[in-house]
């Protein structure tokens, strides 16, 4: 089983507009609302692509109830820890080929709730082969909270795919609790290292050799339309993807995380792991709704992905 962790989930609201007009009224016809947060996007893609998945994290208030009811109508096993605060909304405005996001901060987690979740999570880990940990930390949790989750998983021999940024990611990278895989982009690498990181292959090689990333088995750097650059152990790969019509790119990174977790769970080869992860990312980009894949086109896209050692 794959366990997904979303500590700061949301209801994701998508507003497609031909043009975003500032300081006036914008009317939206086609609004979509989904149980969201990066980890729940991962969750949906996992079950839609055929994996058994349990979702956990914090939920509270009426918005939390909406998320739980959405998940209960799917093949997902919801196993959330209830809190006193209200789960958040996150809004994505899709306009003129751009994506503008408005993200609520979310609830503040009490010390008692934080400790209670660690016990809850420890029990779930014992039933899991792989865990994904995604997104921001809610207010009230220390930057080393993900480190604690990774250590608990490591103690049980469970692989961890971590997808976060900023101080929580830096704290993990500087700790002894190493995830199995991370999926940074250029912007996140630049933030971590305090210098601009381009998409140049030789530069990326040097960056991923830095001591900050030691002990991490898989590093997959997403390069958008340029595919991905990856490091597994001491081996580097460049992944090339076909040009595709993009409908909604929101959630494609989360879909890639789902692919990495699924491939680790089924012990795929390096090339197959990368192809599976990138295929799910592309399939998501072809859907209107966030964090969804239509597996009908899987083989067609998968066959067009090139993976080469560099």
Swiss-Prot record:
Protein EC: 2.7.1.144
First and last residue of the signal peptide: none
GO CC term (a single one): cytosol
Pathway the protein acts in: Carbohydrate metabolism; D-tagatose 6-phosphate degradation; D-glyceraldehyde 3-phosphate and glycerone phosphate from D-tagatose 6-phosphate: step 1/2
Matching InterPro entries: Carboh/pur_kinase_PfkB_CS, LacC, PfkB_dom, Ribokinase-like, Tagatose/fructose_Pkinase
Keyword tags: ATP-binding, Kinase, Lactose metabolism, Nucleotide-binding, Plasmid, Transferase
GO molecular function: ATP binding; phosphofructokinase activity; tagatose-6-phosphate kinase activity
One GO BP annotation of this record: D-tagatose 6-phosphate catabolic process
Catalytic activity: D-tagatofuranose 6-phosphate + ATP = D-tagatofuranose 1,6-bisphosphate + ADP + H(+)
Induction (free text): By lactose. The operon consists of lacABCDFEGX.
Record-linked Pfam families: PfkB
Keyword Kinase: yes
The keyword Cytoplasm is annotated on this UniProt entry: no
Matching Gene3D superfamilies: 3.40.1190.20
Leftover remarks: This gene was sequenced from pMG820, a laboratory-derived deletion of the naturally occurring plasmid pLP712.
Family that this chain belongs to: Belongs to the carbohydrate kinase PfkB family. LacC subfamily.
Cited PANTHER family: 1-PHOSPHOFRUCTOKINASE, 1-PHOSPHOFRUCTOKINASE-RELATED
Protein name: Tagatose-6-phosphate kinase
């Amino acid at each position: 089983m794959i366990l997904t962790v979303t500590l700061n989930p949301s209801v994701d609201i998508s507003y497609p507009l031909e043009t975003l007009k500032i300081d006036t009224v914008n009317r939206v016809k086609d609004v979509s609302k989904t149980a969201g947060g990066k980890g729940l996007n991962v969750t949906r893609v996992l079950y839609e692509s055929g994996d058994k998945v349990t979702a956990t994290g914090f939920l509270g208030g009426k918005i939390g109830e909406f998320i739980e009811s959405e998940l209960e109508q799917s093949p997902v096993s919801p196993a959330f820890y209830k809190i006193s605060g209200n789960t958040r909304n996150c809004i994505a405005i899709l306009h003129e080929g751009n994506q503008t996001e408005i993200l609520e901060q979310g609830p503040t987690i009490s010390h008692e709730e934080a400790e209670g979740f660690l016990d809850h999570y420890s029990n779930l880990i014992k039933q899991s082969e792989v865990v994904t940990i995604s997104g921001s930390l809610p207010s009230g949790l220390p930057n080393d909270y993900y480190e604690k989750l990774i250590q608990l998983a490591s103690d049980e021999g469970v692989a961890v795919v971590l997808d976060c940024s900023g101080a929580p990611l830096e704290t993990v990278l500087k700790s002894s609790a190493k995830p199995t895989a991370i999926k940074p982009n250029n912007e996140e690498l630049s933030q971590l290292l305090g210098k601009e990181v381009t998409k140049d292959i030789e530069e990326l090689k040097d960056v991923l050799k830095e001591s900050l990333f030691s002990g991490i088995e898989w590093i997959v750097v997403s390069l958008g339309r340029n595919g991905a650059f990856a490091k597994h152990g001491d081996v580097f790969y460049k992944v090339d993807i076909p040009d595709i019509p993009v409908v909604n790119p929101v959630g494609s990174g989360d879909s890639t995380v789902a692919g990495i977790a699924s491939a680790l769970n089924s012990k795929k080869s390096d090339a197959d792991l990368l192809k599976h992860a990138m295929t799910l990312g592309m399939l998501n980009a072809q859907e209107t709704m966030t964090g969804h894949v239509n597996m009908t086109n899987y083989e067609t896209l998968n066959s067009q992905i090139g993976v080469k050692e560099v």
